[in-house]
Design a protein with these regions (language model features):
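Short connector loops at secondary-structure junctions
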Residues: 58-70
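N- and C-terminal low-complexity/disordered segments
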Residues: 180-271
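FMN-binding flavodoxin-like domain, especially the glycine-rich phosphate-binding loop
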Residues: 9-13, 17-30, 34-45, 49-60, ...
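Short, solvent-exposed loop/turn elements at domain surfaces
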Residues: 39-42, 63-66, 247
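Short, solvent-exposed polar/charged micro-motifs at secondary-structure junctions
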Residues: 65-68, 167-172, 234
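Positively charged n-region of N-terminal signal peptides that target proteins for export
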Residues: 1-5
Length: 271
């Protein structure tokens, strides 16, 4: 009888222990990001709100807290000297996370230099990496490709990007990204493919100008486009002809959206 009582107590303890472990199960997702001006931080915090994941900001020991021009100048000097910024030790143990949303602003066409420091110090082996970034014109595709190259042991997925000028749309656009990729439940409109490319006409040029003229750098001259209709309006994919800073001719893809009765906005450049 005594043996049966002890056995019952043991089984009950095991069940309680397992239940406690389940209730206290640690999250397997981390939102890890660097933000210089606070814009990328807005995306990270919205991600955390939607996913309920852990979150941590990458901090630089000598912050990039100057003007835009001063930051550019510092980065150029660091690149000349082959130097990278020092970052503070992370509080999170990266080894316990299976999925990491890695956020950054785009600098010089790719992920910001503090994230380069991180990538060189941790290989993210067998981790699923979902990039998210903010930018002036573009860089999501190039930075994602660079992460795939620089982190060959990780599973780098297609990421999320948004122009700083459109940060007010982050809730809406992030909601679509998360649902489309199965991170949260819900359905979204499946956009059709872009139409066949055709030469631009005067009306197309006007749309391009309205969308791009306020950007501080020239985006070239539109020569062709494709388009698609959505529930909210029309999306355009312009092919633009321009020149690189060293004078070489280059074609770029300029994505423009025109929501119903709204001003055209360019959403991304792919060079």
């Amino acid at each position: 009888m005594k043996i049966l009582v002890l056995l019952s107590i043991f089984i009950f303890s095991v069940i309680n222990c397992n239940a406690e472990n389940y209730d206290k199960k640690e999250t397997k997702t981390l939102i890890l990001y660097y933000s210089q001006t606070g814009v990328t931080k807005q995306v990270a915090e919205e991600l955390q709100r939607r996913l309920g994941a852990d979150i941590e900001e990458i901090e630089v020991t000598n912050p990039y807290n100057g003007t835009y021009e001063e930051t550019i100048g510092r980065c150029i000097e660091e690149r000349k000297k082959d130097e990278l910024p020092h970052i503070r030790p992370l509080k999170s143990d990266l080894k316990k996370y299976r999925t990491i949303f890695l956020g950054y602003p785009i600098w010089f066409g790719t992920y910001a230099r503090p994230v380069i420091t991180l990538v060189k110090s941790f290989k993210f082996a067998n981790r699923e990496i979902i990039p998210f970034c903010t930018f002036g014109s573009g860089g999501l595709i190039e930075s994602t490709n660079n992460l795939k190259k620089d982190l060959p042991l990780a599973y780098v997925k297609d990421g999320f990007g948004i122009r700083e000028a459109r940060i007010s749309r982050v809730k809406e656009e992030l909601d679509r990204f998360l649902k489309l990729n199965g991170f949260i439940a819900g359905t979204v409109e499946i956009f059709p493919e872009y139409s066949e490319q055709r030469p631009v006409n005067e009306e197309d040029k006007k749309i391009f100008s309205e969308a791009c003229s306020s950007y501080k750098y020239p985006l070239g001259t539109p020569i062709a486009l494709s388009c698609r209709k959505t529930n909210k309006g029309m999306d355009y994919l312009f092919i633009s002809k321009g020149k690189t800073p060293d004078g070489k001719e280059v074609n770029s893809k300029i994505f423009v959206t025109v929501e119903n009765n709204q001003k055209p906005e360019f959403t991304m450049v792919v060079r």
